[in-house]
Amino acid sequence: MTPDINNQPDIKLSIKQTFGIDSNMEVDAFSKKSEYVPEIDKNYKFDRDTTLAIISGFAFNKRVLVQGYHGTGKSTHIEQIAARLNWPCIRVNLDSHISRIDLIGKDAIVLKDGKQVTQFNEGILPWSIQNPVALVFDEYDAGRPDVMFVIQRVLEAEGNFTLLDKNKVIKQNKFFRLFATSNTVGLGDTTGLYHGTQQINQGQMDRWNIVTTLNYLSLDKEMEIILAKNKELNNTKGKEKVSNMIKVASLTRKGFIAGDISTVMSPRTVLHWAENAEIFKDTGYAFRVTFLNKCDDIEKKTIAEYYQRCFGKELPESMVNIQV
């Protein structure tokens, strides 16, 4: 990884013109795109509160944590903002297999002038810190404790990073930015949905300047997103179908909160359902293979009832079709 370390933002963009959000704020951006800049999704719909929080991270070097249920577009939100700013963006999935060595770096044997020599290869963290890069830690609440304490060193905006193996202190690039996404807010999982997440040290949570929540959207907003991705549904009949799909999803969310079911439909699931319905030309079958088959057998009849309420059609899993 060797992008131009001296590269820096050279233009300013209006948030109102770039993201369609009513704000007079301007944000630094790059005029040229590098290989680390994500591709722009022209159909992406931005959530106002989440967008303002993330842009504050870019504009004012704030550490921003985006928390919310699965499938709501947390990581994509950061990526799509970075794409429009031409800001290099690197995502790291902080699963349990990511170790300190992966982040910091390690000694490796390399050939130099025909001889084997030991050379320290920097990990993703030291490299990112020294470059104008937006580093995004996905699944932040699933990271191992030893890894989390490595990250804690760079959570302060002016915090230097010490490479003990090299007796070297790395200063942060002026345009290095740090973001993270998580399903929980660092207090552990009380829902049972997110196995593998854990409580986060509150001293570390305190270092995040901004914590924004991106959960399920209103029916109109969710429909806007799905229709933007599925333009063939942007007609009277298609809108009615998508509206009913979102109503089914809303019932699963209410059912989950009430304790009736243990699985919920995320906006991502609804999007997949809409896409699969166009593939199979069968809304009911698409619902079953997209979501229902992932659910507990005991709960399938309840979820099939949600479908029947919205679409007026029975599924094979419905109570009326179950033979005793």
Predicted regions and their residues:
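Short flexible/disordered coil segments
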Residues: 156-157, 235-250, 279, 300-304, ...
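C-terminal engagement/docking regions of AAA+ P-loop ATPases
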Residues: 37-41, 280-324
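AAA+ P-loop NTPase catalytic core and its hallmark functional loops
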Residues: 1-239, 247
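Conserved AAA+ ATPase small/helical "lid" subdomain
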Residues: 216-218, 222-289
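Short, hydrophobic/amphipathic alpha-helical patches that form generic packing surfaces
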Residues: 52-60, 271-276, 288-293
